[in-house]
Amino acid sequence: LDIKPEKGFNAELGFKQGYKIGNFQGFVDVAGFYTQYKDMVEFQFGLFNNADYTMINSISDAIRMITDGQGFGIGAQFHNVSKAQIYGVEISTNGVYNFNKNTKLFYNLGYVYTEPRDADYKERNDAEDLYTDPLQMKEKSNTGKYLKYRPKHSFKATVDFQWKRINLGANVAWKSKILAVDYLMMDERPKAQLDLMDYVRGIAFGYSKGETLATYWNKHNTPYATVDLRFGVKVTKEVAFQFMVNNLFNKEYSYRPMAVAAPRTFVLKMDVTF
């Protein structure tokens, strides 16, 4: 593969301030960030010849594979996407609320806003509009300005209530929808009828219980929140037990096609310190 080295520029400006308000004590951190890439390296999912691992990017590639008695597989290949800009802001605070010397509430809250932009998306769309081969792979699932597999918003909160040797905690995480995925997985461009790639997707990813990969993703690529709980007790200085429930409400969500997150999970953990 002819991959150029990725070059970039990064700048970040922010401030961190301590605070004490009554029994609250902690820090607040605010930062803005900007990153610019040239020849940014991204991976692209596609169909590959199982014999020589070359990407199938045309009908002639597919015919040659079949006539040579070879098969195909799904894989990913790194390549340059030219220019990209990623910028945004991050706000966080962490600290403790002191009820008394034996009882405390620890907290950590954070929010990130990101603009992950493909700076060359217009030129790429113009070039892809000229494609005539129905098997020629496009960069992503839509014609938007955003890079693949990235959300715009994310929020996370961690709270731990501690009383003597007992700890009760919770995690809350929220993310907005993913802005774009690979073209091999789905095509969000408006069209009047199915094309060859739609049939290829059906063969590659299957069809189950009335769902295709695209219909499942469209249904589940939405903003989602998850909640985790934990209860711990320190039996001695050396031994501690913790019981955790991850994904408390058994939220069904997917952070990328073909990757369904874990359902509700129960974990019992013992820590021993020597």
Language model regions located:
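Flexible glycine-rich, low-complexity coil/linker segments exposed to the extracellular/periplasmic environment
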Residues: 1, 45-79, 189-218
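Gram-negative outer-membrane beta-barrel transporters
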Residues: 23, 31-36, 50-184
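Conserved C-terminal beta-signal and adjacent last beta-strands/turns
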Residues: 4-6, 10, 86, 104-112, ...
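Switch/connector loops and helix/strand junctions flanking conserved nucleotide-binding motifs
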Residues: 39-43
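Structural signature of Gram-negative outer-membrane beta-barrels, strongest in the C-terminal barrel
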Residues: 1-36, 236
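Short, mixed-charge, low-aromatic patches
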Residues: 27, 64-65, 223-228
